């Protein structure tokens, strides 16, 4: 059938880097483009046709317009025979022509010069629909009867008069922009430089902010009453999002909102190009998976944040995904356009949402919906990137659901029966058997509605699995081709989960981020593939560089909200990795209570979203601005700042003593509002408590580190309120920040004052409120508090890499989570309480029939902390509900049998003279001392401690380590005059799920008995034991084994493991599961797994990272909701040269519980003299490890595992 396209006037084109729009006045009734003829032709590249007409006499020629400064060429890839090109207008014949009284306006969404085949000759991609006279022709409503007056200068088209009011409803309320017009807000003025684009909301202009000389994009909403309500919703959502880190969560940053001539103006950062224009620029060629992956990861991160806030974007499509800077930051994207967004609680099932190509089935069928519709849209987007063509380019909702049903099958019967719009597209025939619903034929639908069905698909798939066969690259071979096929399998698997018709079964953003396609764990089977290395390198863009954010302009924005009301002082902080900067400027906290706003500029170089280590990737020359947002109020007052001059590796904010006195769980704060992103709201445990409340904001730091909550009590005889403050155990610059270091800050603080250290890694649990999770606190004897001043807690760790899990993703919890004390959230919480010896601490463990010593007792919350208990690796217990005496009846270790999640409490009384005779004598009498570590905090015992009970290690191993820098354990030579020591034990309870079989994990080992060591194995662990010499590889037989593989399942060929596990039957119970879902580190070592026999990180060779140019690492994104992801660190602590290693991987279920692991410093390694640079910053444990056993080479990386959501790392 011949088709004709008659153009009545030249097109009006609007274009810029932000977005572009173009209008063509056509007579749309008489043309039809059908791909079903035998002589199919495709649009060709042509710039010679006149701009006023274009006639296609026989087949599919379309006019191409010769417009300067615009790319007119669109070469349609023609090799696919599946695709069918159809018309956007009714092709029923002349009847449709007679019905049209006026010409319509076809508006393309980009600056292409013809009705490109991507839109199927006019198939609309926008959500606006005009369904009259059987034709679907309007892509986007515009005021269109009057063309814009344009001025073309060289290659730049600028707008002099953008819009002319007309009778069209879409033209009502548009603001008439004039070039170089000044838009004024309360605090800034903006000069209009260029028109960027228009939508149903209004228009976007490129403007110049005169005060800062930066380019911004201003969205000018229509003042029509029909847009007023949605404009208010958008402003409120942007106001909420402005309190989050826009760079971290990958959505456009909004600066301010103001009114200009009765039009609402929203000021945004200027972004370069949307994904649709990017596809068009590349002639709609398919995008390789290695480029789709970083885009998917970043958008899924944004959706995860929106889900945690209870927000629905509701218009996710390539046009609303912007490339930030395609040249300097390739494939760095942000999500824009929250004009259709809404809160999930206000979602109405009849609401018309989403652009049609990306519309979820629940919207089409009229079902209740939630934020899962955004995941459907994202699936359609990544499918479009993969195909170069929309997966479901429906010209109408009927075509849309028809395409979906043909490829993925009909929606379930219960969905169709519940849908309010089901009968528009389906017929229910009670005479038929199952299924009860039948999709209407195109003829039936056209007869009922007058809307003719179109075929606009380029690819018609019988199932989504068929997508893996298209667009296969021809330049790959060998392992590269195998890796590409494996990558496609994981991509299709993820795509099917994202395009699940049932929204309740659709994958969530968090699970998407932990899918193997994103974490790339499946690519570890191809270590020598250059294609795989390229994939890892492309994901580097997800590592973000953060520098000082312009908080001044942010404060002026009406979007910026403060936790505290107006105070006399604002203290704006961003953070570095050196605490001495805080020391040098700590006087600001004390002196600026009435001064102007003080700023501690401690900008950090690297904040890794995907947890790349800063040692591996250099900082960018063009860093992305960081965000300092909502704050916490610090009560001004006299301070006694610690005066140590040595730089700590951890960043802390040292708060004055009077700080706690003003802490209330209300918004009535005064003093220093510290602006931060995503801090942890800590809510009081009891009315007597005065905790620190931190609203949502972030203390952005270069690394995301685990938390520890430490509490200091003043020296009073009665119980006092507890002030829980997160302690972080890592630092940003690849250096170990152990509690020994951080606790030394407490040395200079007087004993009778309350001091708090605020770390900089509060982004670990954004949005999670620890309401009643503050458990009974640990008691440090006054002897240590007064004489030692915690001096032994700190070692001189001035070097080394940081071993910590990365937790930087947002929380999934929309509101605060109230946790009862009996059901603690495993957040790695340990309370350290200093009291006088005369004080008594009533504790809940009295209910467990265990007396509490008033002298010194210790309670440790169930936190995922590596417990090093001196020379006795078997003294701690968390996985067993057993009551085993340690010293005598007065010295029990109590594991209370509370409901899951249990609170594992270990109480070890200090040694007193009257208890000397009742203690068990150690088997090794030569061992006189031990050091207990609370997250590597060394606390010395009395000389005749029983810690050597069941210790298979000689005494000289302790002294051998004392000389090493960074050693935690004390030797036996410590005099007995050290006084009473405190034994501090952290017990992490958890269980790990192996496939569908859940087994209890012995996180800290079995309880030791009087005579023999007891080995505990986690999963199939080879059991690296905790000894005074660090972690020691299992030597065999009955060696004491205590794997610290808290959430991993180690695999090894050690046969003694199973022997010990079978020889030590003990009652075991399932502990509270903490799902470590988020991390997935990867390290490549260029070479065969057989090339080396020792662990690459334990080799005494030169530094591993600097000497490995082919080392590519990538860590999966995490979220605070999946904080639990401890490193599988056992194999790092085996002796150097040992041929055994614990290559571990984990199979994690989808259960989500918060958990915070604790980092490991290099001092715990077998040899502290090994250069810390030999170890990767955060996740160096999962490289291909050479082994003397060929059968265990690939145990660390199972071939295409199905449920592995992370690889642990350090």
UniProtKB/Swiss-Prot annotation:
Segments for region (Disordered):
835-856, 938-981, 1046-1069, 1084-1104
UniProt superkingdom: Eukaryota
Q: What class of enzyme is it?
A: transferase
Q: Locate the Phosphoserine modifications and list their residues.
A: 872, 1200
Q: Give the span(s) annotated as Interaction with TP53.
A: 885-1093
* Maturation and modification: Phosphorylated and activated by JNK1. Autophosphorylated.
Q: Please give the residue ranges the record annotates as the region SUMO interaction motifs (SIM).
A: 902-926
Enzyme Commission identifier(s): 2.7.11.1
Location in chain, cross-link Glycyl lysine isopeptide (Lys-Gly) (interchain with G-Cter in SUMO2): 25, 120, 124, 991
Binding of ATP, residues: 196-204, 219
Occurrences of domain Protein kinase (ranges): 190-518
Keyword annotations: ATP-binding, Cytoplasm, Isopeptide bond, Kinase, Nucleotide-binding, Nucleus, Phosphoprotein, Serine/threonine-protein kinase, Transcription, Transcription regulation, Transferase, Ubl conjugation
* Motif (Nuclear localization signal 1 (NLS1)) on chain: 844-847
The subcellular location is: Nucleus; Cytoplasm; Nucleus speckle
Which region ranges are annotated with the description Required for localization to nuclear speckles?
Answer: 891-998
Reactions that this protein is recorded to catalyse: L-seryl-[protein] + ATP = O-phospho-L-seryl-[protein] + ADP + H(+); L-threonyl-[protein] + ATP = O-phospho-L-threonyl-[protein] + ADP + H(+)
GO CC, alphabetical: centrosome; ciliary basal body; cytoplasm; cytosol; nuclear speck; nucleus; PML body
Question: Active site at which residues?
Answer: 315 (proton acceptor)
Q: Where is composition skewed (Low complexity) in this entry? A: 941-959, 1047-1063, 1095-1104
Describe the disruption phenotype. Small eyes with deficient lens, abnormal retinal lamination, and thickened retinas.
Q: What is its main location?
A: nucleus
Q: In which tissues is it expressed?
A: Ubiquitously expressed, with high levels in reproductive tissues. Expressed in the epithelial layer of mammary gland, uterus and epididymis, in the corpus luteum, and in post-meiotic round spermatids.
Query: Assembly and partners?
Result: Interacts with Nkx1-2, Nkx2-5, MYB, PARK7, DAXX and p53/TP53. Part of a cytoplasmic complex made of HIPK1, DAB2IP and MAP3K5 in response to TNF. This complex formation promotes MAP3K5-JNK activation and subsequent apoptosis.
Q: Which family does it belong to?
A: Belongs to the protein kinase superfamily. CMGC Ser/Thr protein kinase family. HIPK subfamily.
According to its UniProt entry, the function of this protein is described as: Serine/threonine-protein kinase involved in transcription regulation and TNF-mediated cellular apoptosis. Plays a role as a corepressor for homeodomain transcription factors. Phosphorylates DAXX and MYB. Phosphorylates DAXX in response to stress, and mediates its translocation from the nucleus to the cytoplasm. Inactivates MYB transcription factor activity by phosphorylation. Prevents MAP3K5-JNK activation in the absence of TNF. TNF triggers its translocation to the cytoplasm in response to stress stimuli, thus activating nuclear MAP3K5-JNK by derepression and promoting apoptosis.
Q: What is this protein called?
A: Homeodomain-interacting protein kinase 1
Which species does this protein come from?
Mus musculus (Mouse)
């Amino acid at each position: 059938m011949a088709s004709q396209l008659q153009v009545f006037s030249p097109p009006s084109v609007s274009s810029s880097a932000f977005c572009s729009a173009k209008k063509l006045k056509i007579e749309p009734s008489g043309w039809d483009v059908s791909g079903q003829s035998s002589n199919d032709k495709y649009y060709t590249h042509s710039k010679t046709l006149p701009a006023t007409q274009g006639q296609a006499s026989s087949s599919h020629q379309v006019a191409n317009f010769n417009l300067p400064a615009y790319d007119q060429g669109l070469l349609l890839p023609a090799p696919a025979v599946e695709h069918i090109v159809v018309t956007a207008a009714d092709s029923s014949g002349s009847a449709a022509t007679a019905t049209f009284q006026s010409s319509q306006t076809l508006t393309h969404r980009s600056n292409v010069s013809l009705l490109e085949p991507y839109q199927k000759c006019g198939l609309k991609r926008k959500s606006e629909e005009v369904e009259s006279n059987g034709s679907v022709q309007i892509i986007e409503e515009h005021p269109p009867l009057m063309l814009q007056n344009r001025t073309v200068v060289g290659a730049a088209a600028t707008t002099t008069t953008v819009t002319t009011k007309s009778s069209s409803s879409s033209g009502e309320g548009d603001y008439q922009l004039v070039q170089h017009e000044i838009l004024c807000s309360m605090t800034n003025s903006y000069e209009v430089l260029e028109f960027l684009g228009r939508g149903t909301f209004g228009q976007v202009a490129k403007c110049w902010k005169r005060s800062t000389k930066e380019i911004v994009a201003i969205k000018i909403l229509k003042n029509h009453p029909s847009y007023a309500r949605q404009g208010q919703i958008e402003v409120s959502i942007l106001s909420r999002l402005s309190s989050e880190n826009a760079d971290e969560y990958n959505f456009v940053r909004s600066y301010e909102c103001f009114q200009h001539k009765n039009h609402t103006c929203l000021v945004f950062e200027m972004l370069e190009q949307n994904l649709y224009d990017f596809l068009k620029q590349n002639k709609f060629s398919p995008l390789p998976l290695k480029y789709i992956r970083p885009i998917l990861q970043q958008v899924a991160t944004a959706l995860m944040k929106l889900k945690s806030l209870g927000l629905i974007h509701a218009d996710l499509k390539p046009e609303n995904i912007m490339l930030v800077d395609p040249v300097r930051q390739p494939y760095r994207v942000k999500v824009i356009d929250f004009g259709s967004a809404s809160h999930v609680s206000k979602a109405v099932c009849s609401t018309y949402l989403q652009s049609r190509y990306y519309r979820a089935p629940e919207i089409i069928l009229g079902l209740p919906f939630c934020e899962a519709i955004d995941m459907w849209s994202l699936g359609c987007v990544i499918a479009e990137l993969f195909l170069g063509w929309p997966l479901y380019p429906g010209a109408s909702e009927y075509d849309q659901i028809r395409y979906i049903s043909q490829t993925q099958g009909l929606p379930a019967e219960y969905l169709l029966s519940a849908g309010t719009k089901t009968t528009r597209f389906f017929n229910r025939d009670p005479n038929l058997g199952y299924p009860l619903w039948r999709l209407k034929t195109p003829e039936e639908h056209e007869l009922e509605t007058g809307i003719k069905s179109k075929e606009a698909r380029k690819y018609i798939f019988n199932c989504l699995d068929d997508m893996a066969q298209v667009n296969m690259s021809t330049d790959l071979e060998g392992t590269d081709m195998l890796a590409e096929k494996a990558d496609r399998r994981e991509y299709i698997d993820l795509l099917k989960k994202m395009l699940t018709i049932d929204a309740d079964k659709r994958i969530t953003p968090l699970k998407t981020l932990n899918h193997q396609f994103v974490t790339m764990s499946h690519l570890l089977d191809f270590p020598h593939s250059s294609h795989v290395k390229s994939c890892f390198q492309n994901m580097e863009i997800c590592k973000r560089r953060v520098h000082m954010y312009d908080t001044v302009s942010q404060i002026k924005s009406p979007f910026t909200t403060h936790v505290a009301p107006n105070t006399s002082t604002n203290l704006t902080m961003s953070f570095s990795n050196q605490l001495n900067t805080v020391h040098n400027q700590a006087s600001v906290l004390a002196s600026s209570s009435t001064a102007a706003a003080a700023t501690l500029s401690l900008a950090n170089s690297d904040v890794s979203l995907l947890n790349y280590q800063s040692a591996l990737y250099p900082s960018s020359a063009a860093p992305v601005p960081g965000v300092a947002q909502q704050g916490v109020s610090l009560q001004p007052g006299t301070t006694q700042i610690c005066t140590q001059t040595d730089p700590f590796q951890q960043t802390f904010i040292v708060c004055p003593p009077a700080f706690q006195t003003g802490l209330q769980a209300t918004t009535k704060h005064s003093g220093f509002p510290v602006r931060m992103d995503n801090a942890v709201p800590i809510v009081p445990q009891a009315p007597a408590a005065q905790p620190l409340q931190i609203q949502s904001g972030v203390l952005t730091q270069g690394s995301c580190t685990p938390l520890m909550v430490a509490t200091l009590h003043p020296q009073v005889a009665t119980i006092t309120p507890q002030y829980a403050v997160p302690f972080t155990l890592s630092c940003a610059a690849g250096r170990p920040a152990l509690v020994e270091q951080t606790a030394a800050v407490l040395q200079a603080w007087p004993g009778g004052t309350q001091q708090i250290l605020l770390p900089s890694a509060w982004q670990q649990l954004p949005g999670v409120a620890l309401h009643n999770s503050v458990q009974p606190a640990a008691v440090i004897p006054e002897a240590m508090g007064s004489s030692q001043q915690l001096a032994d807690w700190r070692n001189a760790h001035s070097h080394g890499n940081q071993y910590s899990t990365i937790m930087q993703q947002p929380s999934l919890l929309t509101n605060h989570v109230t946790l009862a004390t009996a059901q603690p959230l495993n957040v790695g919480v340990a309370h350290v309480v200093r009291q006088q010896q005369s004080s008594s601490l009533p504790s809940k463990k009295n209910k467990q029939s265990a007396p509490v010593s008033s002298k010194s007792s210790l309670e440790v919350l169930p936190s995922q902390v590596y417990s090093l208990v001196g020379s006795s690796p078997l003294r701690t217990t968390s996985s067993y509900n057993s009551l085993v005496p340690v010293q005598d009846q007065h010295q029990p270790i109590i594991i209370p049998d509370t409901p899951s999640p249990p609170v594992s409490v270990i109480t070890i009384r200090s040694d007193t003279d009257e208890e000397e005779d009742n203690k068990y004598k150690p088997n090794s009498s030569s061992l006189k001392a031990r050091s207990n570590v609370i997250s590597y905090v060394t606390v010395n015992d009395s000389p005749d401690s029983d810690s050597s009970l069941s210790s298979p290690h000689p005494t000289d191993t302790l002294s051998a380590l004392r000389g090493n820098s960074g050693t935690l354990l004390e030797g036996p030579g410590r005099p007995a005059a050290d006084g009473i020591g405190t034994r501090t034990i952290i017990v992490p309870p958890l269980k790990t799920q192996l496939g569908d079989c859940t087994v209890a994990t012995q996180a800290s080992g079995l309880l030791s008995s009087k005579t023999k060591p007891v080995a505990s194995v986690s999963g199939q662990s080879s059991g690296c034991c905790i000894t005074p010499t660090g972690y020691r590889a299992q030597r065999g037989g009955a060696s004491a084994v205590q794997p610290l593989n808290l959430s991993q399942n180690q695999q090894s060929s050690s046969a003694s493991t199973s022997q010990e596990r079978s020889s030590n039957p003990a009652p075991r119970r399932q502990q509270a599961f903490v799902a470590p879902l988020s991390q997935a580190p990867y390290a490549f070592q260029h070479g065969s797994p057989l090339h080396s026999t020792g662990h690459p990180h334990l080799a005494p060779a030169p530094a591993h990272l600097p000497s490995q140019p082919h080392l590519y690492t990538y860590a999966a994104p995490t979220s605070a909701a999946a904080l639990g992801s401890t490193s599988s660190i056992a194999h790092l602590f085996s002796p150097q040269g040992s041929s055994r290693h614990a290559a571990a991987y984990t199979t994690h279920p989808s259960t989500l519980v918060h958990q915070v692991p604790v980092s490991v410093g290099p001092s715990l390694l077998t040899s502290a003299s090994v250069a810390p640079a030999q170890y990767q910053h955060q996740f160096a444990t999962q490289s291909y490890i050479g082994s003397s056993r060929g059968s265990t080479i690939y145990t660390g990386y199972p071939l295409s595992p199905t449920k592995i959501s992370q690889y642990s790392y350090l």
